[in-house]
Swiss-Prot record:
Pfam families the record matches: AAA_25 (PF13481), ChlI (PF13541), Zn_ribbon_LapB (PF18073)
UniProt lineage: Bacteria, Bacillati, Bacillota, Bacilli, Bacillales
Gene3D superfamilies hit by this protein: 3.30.230.10, P-loop containing nucleotide triphosphate hydrolases
Keywords associated with the record: ATP-binding, DNA damage, DNA repair, DNA-binding, Hydrolase, Metal-binding, Nucleotide-binding, Stress response, Zinc, Zinc-finger
Record-stated family: Belongs to the RecA family. RadA subfamily.
A GO term from the CC aspect: cytosol
GO BP term, pick one: recombinational repair
Gene name of this polypeptide: radA
Name of this chain's protein: DNA repair protein RadA
Keyword Metal-binding belongs to the record: yes
């Protein structure tokens, strides 16, 4: 007997107006191109069920058993750190990134690593045949009897295969290629992505299966499709980096089961992605000693201190308005710091072009990088280099004061481990904590004092 086809409707994303057919302009709010297709909920789906498939009921929170479910470690410490200690069974993880950055490579390697823990993994590809996936696996030198590969884009066929294989983990590569047969729009459309993600989320919760889904990104770098996609999943990971460079950075921008401040570093090689155990050495290995405009900051990425080089190039402008550019550092932060240098130190920067960069493709957004940015700008402006063994840590206030930062001891220890002998920190961070041997800690109260000591006349 043929399966009854579920009816669809069109809903305005601006005001919620519903229509039986698509319209270019919503008659209720007069917005254009806001009508998207959605499935009419069946009578069965209107009943409330919990994640086990049983009827749901309200329960006092004091009567709910407090059980911390064990995470599954992936044998990839960098990924475990970003996920908060491992994969949570029943969770749904969205992995986004530019084309060719290595999303599929990462997940295929993760799948193989999970099979080493006697877990069954189903890798579903909507972009490659099973033979193509096998060729990629051979290049990456990954294999395993518990790694199942399936090439399909029909969501119902995917659900049947999951029920048959009964995996512990599922990878969907990618969500934009999967389609729901009851939705008439093309795969990758707003309605298809929403319905397919909702169905996969139900599978993850009801069967306690961890599901990784790959998401395409737009040219602006955001996950393609409705913003609802990122709201529905438990964790959103972004894989960043330049395709023409070897290093990749994995960040969590949403994580219901851990911190969103952690960062994992990988290096792309012929055999796939290799973890970088000490990223500070990587980011500093090509630093040119004795160059003006170059400073080093000890930045915290979650619980890990990372040393990053900050480069500044300040030169007289050839046009009426000075140009400002920043890569890896917030543009507004750069403008604020340069304004403080003009007002509190007297640097004439209004007729100077300024270009700043965090080396290695890292994005720095914490306040502790302010002092290093300010010193690098002043160093380039005066064409006077700092010592190659100097490190700068501190937040810069609008009145020119250097404000205290968190976890100063960890930052100083990381800098000392890599051979930095003189470390500038806020005066208020000086205390009873242990200073590493052969390291001079310089406490400064203002940016003027810091520049006098770092760039003496």
């Amino acid at each position: 007997m043929a399966k009854a086809k579920r009816t669809t409707k069109f809903v305005c994303q601006s005001c919620g107006y519903e229509s039986a057919k698509w319209m270019g302009k919503c008659p209720n709010c007069n917005e254009w191109n806001q009508m998207v297709e959605a499935l009419e909920p069946s009578k069965k789906s209107r009943s409330a069920f919990n994640h086990t498939g049983e009827p749901s009921k309200a329960t006092p929170i004091t009567q709910i058993a407090s059980e911390e479910e064990a995470r599954v470690e992936t044998n990839m410490p960098e990924l475990n750190r970003v996920l908060g200690g491992g994969v949570v069974p029943g969770s749904m993880v969205l992995v986004g990134g530019d084309p060719g950055i290595g999303k599929s490579t990462l997940l295929l390697q993760v799948s193989a690593q999970l099979t080493l823990t006697n877990k069954k993994v189903l890798y579903i590809s909507g972009e490659e045949s099973i033979k193509q996936t096998k060729l990629r696996a051979e290049r990456l030198q990954v294999s395993g009897d518990n790694l199942y590969v399936y090439a399909e884009t029909n969501l119902e066929a995917v659900q049947e295969t999951i029920d048959f294989v009964k995996p512990d983990f599922v990878v969907i590569d990618s969500i934009q290629t999967v389609y729901h047969p009851d939705v008439t729009s093309a795969a990758g459309s707003v309605s298809q992505v929403r319905e397919c993600t909702a169905a996969l989320m139900r599978i993850a919760k009801m069967q306690n299966i961890a599901i990784f889904i790959v998401g395409h990104v737009t040219k602006e770098g955001a996950i393609a499709g409705p913003r609802l996609l990122e709201h529905m999943v438990d964790t959103v990971l972004y894989f960043e980096g330049e395709r023409h460079h070897a290093y990749r950075i994995l960040r969590a921008v949403k994580n219901r089961f851990g911190s969103t401040n952690e960062m994992g570093i990988f290096e792309m090689r012929d055999i796939g992605l290799v973890e970088v155990a000490n990223p500070s050495e990587v980011f500093l290995e090509e630093r040119l000693e004795g160059a003006s405009g170059s400073t080093v900051v000890a930045s915290m990425e979650g619980t890990r201190p990372v040393l990053v080089e900050i480069q500044a190039l300040v030169s007289p402008t050839m046009f009426g308005n000075a140009k400002r550019m920043a890569t890896g550092i917030d543009y507004n932060k750069v403008s604020l710091i340069m304004a403080v240098l003009e007002k509190r130190v007297g640097l004439m920067l209004q007729n100077q072009d300024a270009y700043l960069k965090a080396a290695g493709g890292v994005k720095l957004d914490e306040p502790a990088v302010d002092l290093a940015v300010a010193v690098s700008v002043a160093s380039s402006y005066r064409d006077k280099p700092t010592r190659s063994t100097d490190c700068f840590i501190g937040e810069l206030g609008l009145t020119g004061e250097i404000r205290r930062v968190a976890r100063i001891e960890q930052r100083v220890q990381e800098a000392a481990k890599l051979g930095f002998k003189r470390i500038f920190i806020p005066k208020n961070n000086e205390g009873t904590w242990k200073v590493p041997k052969d390291v001079q800690v310089v406490g400064v109260e203002t940016i003027g004092e810091a520049l006098k000591k770092a760039l003496p006349d």
